[in-house]
Swiss-Prot record:
Residues 49-89 are annotated as: deca-GX3 motif. This is Protein yae1. GO terms for cellular component: cytoplasm; nucleus. The keyword Nucleus applies. The complex LTO1:YAE1 may function as a target specific adapter that probably recruits apo-RPLI1 to the cytosolic iron-sulfur protein assembly (CIA) complex machinery. May be required for biogenesis of the large ribosomal subunit and initiation of translation. Belongs to the YAE1 family. It is found in: Cytoplasm; Nucleus.
Length: 213
């Protein structure tokens, strides 16, 4: 007969045979087989959830980008259009003046020394027109939307490390480009002149309508 002391030591050092309950607990658990269609259903649900999440997030961010970016683009576009419109108006003015002079001048025989001043004035006018044409072509190229915002995304990532909002970077980039052209074309002076001419045009329309009545 084994003494209680020996039995307790056997339990500590593992020399005693395992108990029945220990044998039962060490048996590997047998999992129930998973239905064959369950993995396929799981993949379908994961895919559907992923697509819904992408659609919801994309729609939200697209709308936010539109709300934040559209006013900036519209404002800068109006400023760029003003610059191009002023140059184009000047260019058309030179073209119309040259065409009217060509129609009004009859073909005449010129004596030696005559017409020198007129020829010089016409040459200066043509040179001015060519200068305006080059300026117009340059403005159209540099104020194109891709040129205005070129490098704004790279600059935001490199310099600000994403701390500034994209629309803020776009506004600053576009303003820097367009402001240079506004100073070169003197847009502020043109707007003042146009504002001064508007009341006169309104008075002329009012007087014309009164005379017709």
């Amino acid at each position: 007969m084994t003494s209680p002391q020996t039995s307790s030591l056997d339990d500590i050092f593992g020399s005693s045979p395992p108990h029945e309950d220990e044998k039962f607990s060490q048996r590997p658990s047998i999992q129930a087989p998973e239905p064959s269609d369950l993995p396929s259903l799981r993949r379908q649900h994961v895919t559907a959830g992923y697509r819904d999440g992408v659609s919801a997030a994309k729609g939200e961010h697209v709308q936010h980008g539109f709300d934040a970016g559209f006013p900036i683009g519209a404002q800068l576009g109006m400023r760029a259009g003003t610059v191009i419109g002023i140059i184009e108006g000047l260019l058309r003015g030179f073209e119309n003046r040259t065409a009217s002079r060509a129609v009004k001048k009859p073909l005449q025989w010129k004596e030696e020394g005559q017409g020198t001043e007129a020829d010089e004035a016409e040459a200066a006018r043509q040179a001015k027109r060519e200068q305006l044409l080059r300026l117009y072509q340059k403005a159209v190229k540099e104020l194109e939307v891709r040129s205005v915002f070129a490098g704004s995304e790279e600059g935001s990532t490199r310099d600000n490390e994403g701390q500034e909002k994209p629309e803020v970077v776009l506004r600053r980039k576009g303003d820097a480009v367009i402001s240079q052209w506004e100073e070169q074309v003197r847009v502020a002076q043109w707007e003042e002149n146009m504002a001064a001419l508007e009341p006169k045009e309104d008075e002329q329309r009012a007087s014309t309508s009164t005379e017709q009545i």
